[in-house]
């Protein structure tokens, strides 16, 4: 099994910590919230052994990577720029990009905006959707009004940070159990409570002292140590740029994704539970080669089902290079 090594790379004005293994065509893995390169621990050696140079950065604001203080420094333009700069810093001209959760918009947008660099894209949990006619926060406020919705709760700097950083281990356990296939009742209402106008985010998740089978105490220790050190401000700033990114992405309205693409999700993932997601994806992605739905799996796709995820990713990668 390929050994994972770590180093730092200068990219787009920040220093990024990367995990990497293998030699061959470049594959970049973009993690989600609240995670780090470590969420790809089951994929990096497998893809490397299959003949790829696999790189998983801690993204802007996470882990060992720099966390600029300004909220405005976390738009999708910044995040895509980080990955473009990473590819160039590695001495490469092209890459396949794979993203999960928040890493999925980074991957989708990287492929949409820089098709000259990203020759293929596969995303987990968060499907591709066209740019909407109104700003995302406006749409959310129209839908939820004054009721609790986690993305709106995350908007005010300091509020969610205070809650999430109070007991980091409990926070990480609640996230990783509560959004997984191990938790009961995977419905979108878990993250939007129409009965409460004033609520806390962790109240919406179903915590458990018993870890799911796919998560070890050592895994939880790693995530806890990383977020105890780095905090949640940088990661939460990603959520605070929905409208700013929407405004800046106007020139890309109607852009088609023409490179080969794939989508993978668990059938118990509450993020994917929009019945129209496949039609929306096919509206934008003209070469969507496969949609893979993994039974019994929740939001943490590649951690909950590493073998099924690896099989799907290798099938996609070999289709590009076959």
Task: List where the protein language model places each region.
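Glycine-rich phosphate-binding loop signature in dinucleotide/nucleotide-binding domains
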Residues: 22, 90-93, 320
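Short acidic-hydrophobic surface loop/beta-edge motif
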Residues: 5-11
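Flexible "cap/lid" subdomain of the alpha/beta-hydrolase fold that forms the substrate-access gate
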Residues: 2, 15-16, 62-98, 102-289
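Conserved HGGG/HGGXW glycine-rich cap/lid loop of the alpha/beta-hydrolase fold
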Residues: 17-66, 281
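Catalytic active-site module of serine/aspartate enzymes centered on a nucleophile-bearing elbow/loop
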Residues: 287-322
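Signature tryptophan residues that serve as conserved aromatic anchors
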Residues: 33, 37-40, 102, 108, ...
């Amino acid at each position: 099994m390929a050994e994972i090594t770590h180093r730092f790379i200068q990219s787009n004005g920040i220093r990024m910590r990367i995990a990497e293994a293998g030699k061959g065509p470049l594959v970049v893995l973009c993690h989600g919230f609240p995670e780090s390169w470590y969420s790809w621990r089951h994929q990096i050696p497998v893809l490397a052994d299959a003949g790829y140079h696999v790189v998983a950065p801690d993204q802007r604001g996470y882990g060992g990577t720099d966390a600029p203080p300004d909220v405005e420094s976390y738009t999708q333009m910044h995040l895509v720029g980080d990955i473009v700069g990473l590819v160039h810093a590695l001495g490469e001209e092209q890459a396949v990009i794979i993203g999960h959760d928040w890493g999925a918009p980074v991957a989708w947008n990287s492929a949409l905006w820089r098709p000259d660099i990203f020759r293929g894209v596969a995303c987990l949990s968060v499907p591709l959707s066209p740019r909407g006619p109104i700003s995302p926060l406006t749409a959310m406020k129209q839908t939820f009004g004054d009721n609790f919705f986690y993305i709106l709760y995350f908007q005010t700097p300091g509020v969610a940070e205070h809650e999430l950083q109070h007991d980091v281990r409990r926070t990480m356990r609640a996230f990783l159990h509560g959004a997984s296939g191990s938790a009961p009742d995977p419905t979108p209402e878990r993250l939007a409570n129409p009965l409460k106008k004033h609520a806390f985010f962790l109240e919406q998740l179903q915590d458990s002292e018993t870890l799911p089978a796919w998560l070890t105490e050592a895994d939880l220790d790693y995530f806890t140590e990383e977020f105890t050190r780095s905090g949640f401000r940088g990661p939460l700033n990603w959520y605070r740029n929905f409208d700013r990114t929407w405004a800046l992405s106007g020139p890309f309205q109607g852009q088609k994704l023409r490179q080969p693409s794939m989508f993978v999700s668990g059938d118990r993932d509450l993020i994917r539970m929009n019945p129209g997601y496949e039609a929306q994806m096919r509206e934008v992605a003209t070469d969507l080669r496969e949609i893979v739905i993994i039974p019994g799996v929740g939001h943490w796709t590649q951690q909950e089902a590493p073998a099924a995820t690896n099989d799907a990713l290798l099938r996609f990668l070999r289709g590009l290079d076959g």
